[in-house]
Design a protein with these regions (language model features):
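Conserved small-residue
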Residues: 17-550
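Bacterial signal peptide processing site
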Residues: 12-13
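Sec-dependent signal peptide recognition
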Residues: 1-4
Length: 550
């Protein structure tokens, strides 16, 4: 039986001094859990010490794609006319929360079209949870949506859902498809009942706010890119936005004009400058102010890309007079924003706008984030460093702000937060100033990663009341993707569970008070067929780890 030790050190704060070069942490546990597969193929560690008290870990499966729960089928996709499509196996975020004082799961599906479900739960006094009814959120107001990835709650009780994998509007064809069918964008025709001419790439790739008593709404002011997660800070005004671009993404910070109202504000993108050792210093480049209304008005006209930008092909590292070279996920381009469209351009093409503003657009697979508010640290998962973040692998004129050694296993970084310093930059106590690697995977032979270290980190969650960062994996470089607990004070890494074979670990969210207990939400996307029930194919699933004592 694997024993996992979890400690409490409430006085710890993130160090302000530059760190030493990264050293792999001590690891607790064997390379693979020896426990047999449990519910839905999950392998769970045995006992843990939780804040000094022995605790037997418990995983509670709650929902599976295709389950009929009450009157609806969990994960059923529909077209805009209500025609039933397939059941989506791309279950991603599935977070436990309270709605009107009652527990529920809010779940995202990474499909085309995407879907969001809300599942009511019953809670027993001993911490047992059970799904009682599910309902699909009507996404008509946001044209269905595309690839709903991670999510986060707001202090106002709403929910921010992130759409990733935005298509390149430069490649839109007259029939509504995009020429390279990026991430199968053209499959969105299913939402439009086969008529993709009614759609535009700029309708997808946004943060969507879900409320109890209002239709879902795009937050156009937050910008369009491959949103992994929009994470609000405690001031309910500052929101960090991670970009799940394959090789040319940015890190964004949005500041709303008014707390809790994300319909207007200033969007910033980070410039990373190499400092001492492994540290990078962060400065913030403004992409300007915008409102939902002014961006939505431009998109409603369904403009061509060239109606908003002047475009030319670079000659090496040179552009025609008046145009500027921008290196992003889409490669090197010469661009200039049309006069009068600056606000809209900065949002419909936020990554390109970030490059034009001098921000760093070299991050690869910037994934989940988690906030340690007491330690003034924001944690960010970078799933790998193999192209954009590695020196010399991009074309002429690329700046190479990031100078990382290639590492296909990726890492988790710690961003130290403090008061905004630049007069023209973001303000308040939640502005990131430095970034340093906290924990990195260790490459092994044959495109693998060492089993006693993390590999391809994705979802993160900070466990309040401890010094523990939960880390979920999404890759193919371990025998099975794992959920880890990392004690940031002791520097100890512990494997807590392994996903079903072939599945990624996703949907992490710490919920501290449900019926007197605390839980860690966790989901498993696209398991291998051998973990299906007797009815047939593999089924994504979600549940909770816990209860943990409060």
């Amino acid at each position: 039986m694997l024993i996992v030790t979890v400690g409490l050190l409430s006085c710890f704060r993130a160090p302000a001094a530059p760190p030493a070069p990264f050293v792999p942490p001590a690891t607790s546990g064997r390379a693979e859990l020896e426990a047999p597969d449990g519910p839905d193929g999950v392998r769970l560690a045995g006992r843990t010490v939780w804040n000094g008290t022995p605790l037997t870990l418990r995983y509670q499966p709650l929902v599976r794609a295709g389950d009929r729960i009450g009157d609806e089928v969990f994960g059923q996709l529909v077209s805009r006319s209500g025609r039933a499509l397939e059941v989506c196996e791309g279950l991603d975020y599935s977070g436990l929360r309270l709605s009107g004082g009652q527990p529920e799961l809010i779940s995202h599906f990474e499909c085309q079209p995407g879907a969001i479900y809300r599942t009511a739960l019953a809670a027993s006094a001993d911490g047992t949870l059970r799904a009682t009814a599910t309902r699909r959120v009507d996404m008509s107001a946001v044209d269905g949506g595309n690839f709903y990835c991670a999510g986060a709650p707001t202090r106002a009780g709403t929910h921010l859902a992130s759409q990733e994998y935005e298509a390149d509007a430069r490649k839109r064809l007259p029939d509504g498809t995009v020429a390279d069918n990026f991430e199968d964008y053209n499959a969105l025709a299913a939402w439009w009942d086969g008529d993709l001419t009614a759609a535009h790439p700029w309708q997808y790739g946004w943060v969507v706010e879900v409320a109890d008593r209002a239709p879902p709404a795009r937050r156009w002011a937050m910008g369009r890119f491959s949103h992994e997660l929009a994470l609000p800070m405690p001031d309910d005004r500052t929101v960090y936005l991670s970009d799940d671009s394959a090789e040319g993404g940015a890190l964004y910070l949005f500041q709303a004009d008014r707390p809790g109202d994300y319909s207007a504000g200033i969007l910033y993108a980070a410039r990373w400058t190499h400092g001492e050792g492994a540290r990078y210093d962060l400065s913030w480049r403004s992409l300007g102010h915008a409102t939902d209304a002014e961006v939505a008005a431009v998109v409603a006209r369904r403009p061509a890309f060239e109606d908003v930008f002047d475009v030319a092909t670079p000659d090496g590292d040179r552009c025609p007079d008046g145009l500027s070279l921008a290196w992003t996920h889409w490669g090197g381009e010469c661009l200039r924003v049309k006069a009068g469209l600056e606000a809209a351009a900065s949002r419909v093409e936020a990554r390109r706008a970030a490059a034009l503003a001098g921000a760093t657009t070299e991050l690869e697979k910037a994934e989940g984030m988690a906030l340690d508010a007491g330690g003034s640290t924001l944690y960010l998962a970078l799933s790998r460093y193999v192209r954009g973040a590695v020196v010399g692998l991009r074309g002429p004129g690329a700046r190479d702000d990031l100078q990382l050694a290639p590492n296909a296993c990726g890492g988790v970084w710690g961003l130290v937060l403090g008061e905004g310093r630049a007069a023209e930059g973001p303000s308040g106590a939640w502005v990131a100033h430095t970034a340093s690697p906290l924990l990195e995977g260790v490459p092994a032979d044959g495109d693998r990663c060492q089993e006693d270290a993390i590999a391809n980190p994705d979802n993160l969650a900070w466990i309040e009341g401890t010094r523990i960062l939960a880390i979920g994996e999404d890759g193919h470089r371990h025998a099975r993707n794992a959920l880890w607990f990392y004690d940031v004070a002791a520097g100890r890494l512990s494997r807590v569970l392994e996903a079903p074979s072939g599945a990624e670990v996703t949907g992490l969210r710490w919920t501290p008070d449900v019926a007197g207990h605390s839980f860690l939400s966790v989901a498993f996307q696209h398991p291998a067929p051998r973990h299906a029930d007797g009815g047939g194919g593999a089924r994504s699933s979600a549940g909770v780890l816990g209860p943990f004592p409060r």
